[in-house]
């Protein structure tokens, strides 16, 4: 197994405190099958945590959308190793499967536009019936917070699910600081009680759904 560090940290004990980490959780098999979502590779996904299971959401993708995942990995690999993964073996012909439109979006510190943040804002602004959200951390940008509040005030059924217990008490306290203003706008808030909710998903009007590794916080959007 060829393992390479992404932006290697000199002091590993500080790695979880520094910005510009690679937060993506993707798997591509033979350029034809992809997996994406919130799951890391760690014992806790099998063993759970002290207060219950580790609840996450990951999806399997086939068809041309796999190219998007392969491209994201290839760019990161090239950045880290200075090697190009451009051979046809990595991008084989892939037939269309099913009838669902899938778009792969990535964001990072490089680039003029924040594709994931903008897509969330557009989808939320276009909602007519409901917005259902699962996220382990809720530290929204001002624009995202206002978009959710406006939707709820416009009689859209907005529901937010967070973990009752968090792996980061500090982040949990920060997340809870936003909840009063959400409740005042009519947003319904639920707490997952069977363990730690690590899933990052949004479903809107049974027409739009996003599943990935983006938390609803300003750090993920940047």
Residue ranges and their predicted role:
Residues 1-222:
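Charged, low-complexity intrinsically disordered terminal segments
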């Amino acid at each position: 197994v060829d393992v390479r560090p992404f932006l290697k940290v000199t002091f590993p004990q500080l790695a979880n405190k520094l910005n510009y980490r690679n937060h993506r959780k993707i798997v591509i098999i033979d350029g034809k099958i992809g997996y994406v979502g919130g799951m890391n590779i760690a014992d806790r996904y099998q063993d759970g945590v002290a207060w219950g299971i580790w609840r996450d959401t990951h999806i399997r993708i086939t068809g041309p959308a796999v190219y998007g995942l392969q491209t994201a990995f290839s760019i990161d690999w090239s950045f880290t190793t200075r090697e190009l993964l451009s051979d046809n073996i990595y991008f084989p012909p892939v037939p269309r499967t099913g009838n669902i439109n899938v778009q792969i979006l990535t964001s990072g510190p490089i680039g003029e536009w924040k594709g994931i943040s903008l897509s969330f804002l557009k989808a939320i602004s276009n909602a007519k019936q409901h917005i259902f959200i699962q996220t382990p951390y809720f530290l929204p940008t001002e624009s995202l917070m206002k978009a959710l509040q406006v939707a709820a005030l416009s009689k859209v059924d907005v529901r937010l699910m967070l973990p009752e217990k968090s792996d980061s008490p500090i982040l949990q306290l920060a997340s809870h600081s936003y909840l009063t203003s959400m409740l005042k706008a009519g947003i319904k808030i639920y707490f997952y009680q069977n363990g730690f909710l690590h899933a990052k998903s949004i479903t809107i009007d049974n027409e739009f759904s996003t599943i990935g590794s983006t938390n609803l916080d300003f750090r993920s959007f940047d």
